[in-house]
């Protein structure tokens, strides 16, 4: 019999011509639907009714395991599956039972095959449901949620036809309440809802000091919204699209559940060859956060398989950053913990004919279409002997590798599993001269630790096939790898290589230079870990790569520091002010609230003497429209003192520059209120203040179109300003590195580790308000 025209075949199933043409554009779907329709015609003849056609289309578009197509089409064609509800149950059943053979008796029971629900049963179930809600129905009448009645009746009669249930509900409600009256047609008042929404908005966003709005801090599960909520349950790995099953899968999953007790297990697996950056913060939050949200555990596993690039300081710094962000690893492990097991598995892989020793050089393997290895089909015994020779150091670096026999998604053929490296390892010393690659190590370490959800950034998607293949080739437990989009920031570079170039060029001091977006740099600048976590939460977890503006991160920083950084006063460009009629023979102690908006958080004292210092920019000899601070004829208040000062005399130096102001003071409540109150210091400490701006001038400094000269040509010459002679009040005298303050009217500042006795150094973390020019 000739194969009918596909368009005619699809329209014969009840699809519109447009829908049929659209389906034909999808090769996989059209192939599957064609097979389903052709098989159904063998049972039903050339004419297929629309209801059956709809089920066949639903099957073809939703079935992931094509091995089950013929089995399910048979049930549809023979009218054993005749409702959408049954089809959904059937699809869920085959997804949950990936291995042959299918228990047909169990399958039919779970899918309602042969179950007949009579009109009388529907009538009785609906009547029982209505009786349960009768009092409320009589009060609310047609405003009552009919969906609730439908849902309860459906639950009582799982395989009943939905339309029949709805018709019965409508009929019995009409019989109980009678026809709708005018009052039933009125919409429910929305006053309560509007008030609730207003309350929610006030709860979510509080107006805070300096006119800013504090953003809502997202909960852990809100952070894990989107794709992450579709994750499989532990032990149900096979329900994940694309997961590869073997005859051993279900037994291995059973053993896995016995070991883990159904516990969620994740891991954060950094390479110890550099410092973590803001993108890693998302990975840390996702891995640790997902485990925590599900009462699970998260490993910190160092992928230490590149001994020549690893340094002890990176291990320490990575652990410090994970704990600084507020997470405690269940266990700290190393890929090197498993070197013996990994080697034994490599030998087993060769024995199974799935790996071979190759002598192609690294340069021969590069490019899009490298030549196939002439050693791919060498005898197993020969590869075993050569691999042992590699382990014993009988090959020079680059002379031999162990390669796996598979083709990856990106077309890369036979990835390398082991290579020769004559570099002592920081943990194993000179025990090994062969080291496993990421492609070989990653999935097997996940398997050893019984990771349930292996969460990776999107660039590792091309390695998913090798992940599943390797675990299955060795018949070991196979976790699920799930990829999500990286988090990037504009005006930043985070590549280890490029940061080293910045350091070498003198553009930054080191990995922790506050202008960088490494986590050590952000900590040094004064970014609280809670702010970084909140930022990651707001970004969320999606498959798409995300590039964010730095000002969004800075907004999260302000939200946290506004509530946690006590206030102090500092003057960047000091101008001396002498109060000629100071009201006391000695300095007064001024009580200043640590947090003006919440005085329950305590106070600190600062001295107020006859000589104070104000910002030079807070004085102008001639006032101008809009200017409210100190000028001739325009007094100004001194914050927290209760006093107002008025200019009497300007003292100039030999160059004509203003050196000192002589003023008189009065109580603020003894006359007209001044237009402004300014900050000041008296008997202050001298300090160094470092003001930071963006390191790069363009959004995408690595883009050759935007920055043709390369990222080093895009440096902002004004990214750092050092003020040596700044003054700060004595309340910060005992501050330690990383202590944070809000300097009133100036911004948030953090004590730098460069501070020493007698010289405090402050880094400006962020300004008080976002600079509109930065958006």
Swiss-Prot record:
Catalytic activity: tRNA(Gln) + L-glutamine + ATP = L-glutaminyl-tRNA(Gln) + AMP + diphosphate
GO molecular function terms listed in the Swiss-Prot or TrEMBL record: ATP binding; glutamine-tRNA ligase activity; protein kinase binding; protein kinase inhibitor activity
Major localization class: cytoplasm
Classification via CDD domains: GlnRS_core
EC number: 6.1.1.18
PANTHER family linked to this entry: GLUTAMINE--TRNA LIGASE, GLUTAMINE-TRNA LIGASE
Listed name of the protein: Glutamine--tRNA ligase
Organism: Rattus norvegicus (Rat)
């Amino acid at each position: 019999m000739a194969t009918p025209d596909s368009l005619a075949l699809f329209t014969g199933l009840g699809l519109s011509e447009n829908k049929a043409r659209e389906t034909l554009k999808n090769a996989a779907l059209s192939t599957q639907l064609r097979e389903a329709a052709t098989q159904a015609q063998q049972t039903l003849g050339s004419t297929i009714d629309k209801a059956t056609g709809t089920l066949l289309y639903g099957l073809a578009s939703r079935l992931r395991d094509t091995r089950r197509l013929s089995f399910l089409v048979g049930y549809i064609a023979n009218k054993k599956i005749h409702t959408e509800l049954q089809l959904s149950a059937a699809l869920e059943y085959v997804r949950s039972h990936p291995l042959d053979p299918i228990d047909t008796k169990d399958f039919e029971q779970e899918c309602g095959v042969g179950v007949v629900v009579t009109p009388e049963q529907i009538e009785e179930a609906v009547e029982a449901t209505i009786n349960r809600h009768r009092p409320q129905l009589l009060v609310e009448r047609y405003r009552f949620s009919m969906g609730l009645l439908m849902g309860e009746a459906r639950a009582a009669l799982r395989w009943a036809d939905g339309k029949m249930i709805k018709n019965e509900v409508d009929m019995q409600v009409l019989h109980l309440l009678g026809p709708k009256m005018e009052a039933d047609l009125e919409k429910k008042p929305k006053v309560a809802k509007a008030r609730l929404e207003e309350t929610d908005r006030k709860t979510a966003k509080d107006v805070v000091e300096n006119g800013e709005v504090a953003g809502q801090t997202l909960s852990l599960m809100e952070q894990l919204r989107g794709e992450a909520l579709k994750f499989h349950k532990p032990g149900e790995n096979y329900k994940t699209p694309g997961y590869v099953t073997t005859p051993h899968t279900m037994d291995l999953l059973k053993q896995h559940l016995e070991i883990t007790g159904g516990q969620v297990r994740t891991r954060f697996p950094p390479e110890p060859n550099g410092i973590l950056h803001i993108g890693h913060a998302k990975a840390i939050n996702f891995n640790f956060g997902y485990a925590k949200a599900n009462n699970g555990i998260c490993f910190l596993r160092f992928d230490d398989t590149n001994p020549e690039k690893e340094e002890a300081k990176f291990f320490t710094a990575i652990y410090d950053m994970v704990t600084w962000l507020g997470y405690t690893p269940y266990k700290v492990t190393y890929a090197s913990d498993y070197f013996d097991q990994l080697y034994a598995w490599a030998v087993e892989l060769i024995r199974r004919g799935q790996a071979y020793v190759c002598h192609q050089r690294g340069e021969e393997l590069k490019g899009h279409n490298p030549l196939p290895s002439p050693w791919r089909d060498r005898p197993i015994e020969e590869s075993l002997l050569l691999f042992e020779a590699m382990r014993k150091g009988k090959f020079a670096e680059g002379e031999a590798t162990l390669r796996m026999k598979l083709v990856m998604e990106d077309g890369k053929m036979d990835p390398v599993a082991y290579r020769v490296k004559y570099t002592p390892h920081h943990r194993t010393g000179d025990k090994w001269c062969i080291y496993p690659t990421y492609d070989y190590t990653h999935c097997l370490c996940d398997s050893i630790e019984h990771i349930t959800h292996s969460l990776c950034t999107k660039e590792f998607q091309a390695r998913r096939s090798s992940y599943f293949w390797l675990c299955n080739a060795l018949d070991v437990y196979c976790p699920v790898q799930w990829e999500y989009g990286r988090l990037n920031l504009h005006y930043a570079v985070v590549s280890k290589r490029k940061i080293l170039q910045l350091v070498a060029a003198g553009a930054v001091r080191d990995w922790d230079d506050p202008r960088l977006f490494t986590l050590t740099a952000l900590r040094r600048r004064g970014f609280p870990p809670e702010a970084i976590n909140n930022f990651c939460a707001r970004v969320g977890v999606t498959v798409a790569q995300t590039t964010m503006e730095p000002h969004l991160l800075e907004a999260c920083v302000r939200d946290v520091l506004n509530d946690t950084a006590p206030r102090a006063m500092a003057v960047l460009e000091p101008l001396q002010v002498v109060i000629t009629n100071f009201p006391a023979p000695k300095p007064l102690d001024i009580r200043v609230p640590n947090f003006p908006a919440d005085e329950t958080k305590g106070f600190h004292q600062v001295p107020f003497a006859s000589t104070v210092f104000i910002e030079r920019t807070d004085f102008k000899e001639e006032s101008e429209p809009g200017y409210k601070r100190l000028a001739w004829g325009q007094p100004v208040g001194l914050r927290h003192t209760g006093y107002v000062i008025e200019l009497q005399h300007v003292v100039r130096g030999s160059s004509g520059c203003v050196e000192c102001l002589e003023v008189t003071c009065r109580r603020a409540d003894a006359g007209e209120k001044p237009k402004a109150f300014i900050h000041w210091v008296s008997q202050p400490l001298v300090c160094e203040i470092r003001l930071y701006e963006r390191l790069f001038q363009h959004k995408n400094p690595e883009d050759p179109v935007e920055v043709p000269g390369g990222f080093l040509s895009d440096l902002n010459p004004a990214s750092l300003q050092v003020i040596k002679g700044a003054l700060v009040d004595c309340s910060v005298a005992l501050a330690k590195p990383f202590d944070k303050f809000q300097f009133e009217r100036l911004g948030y500042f953090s004590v730098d580790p460069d501070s020493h006795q007698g010289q405090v150094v402050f880094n400006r973390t962020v300004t008080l308000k976002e600079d509109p020019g930065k958006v």
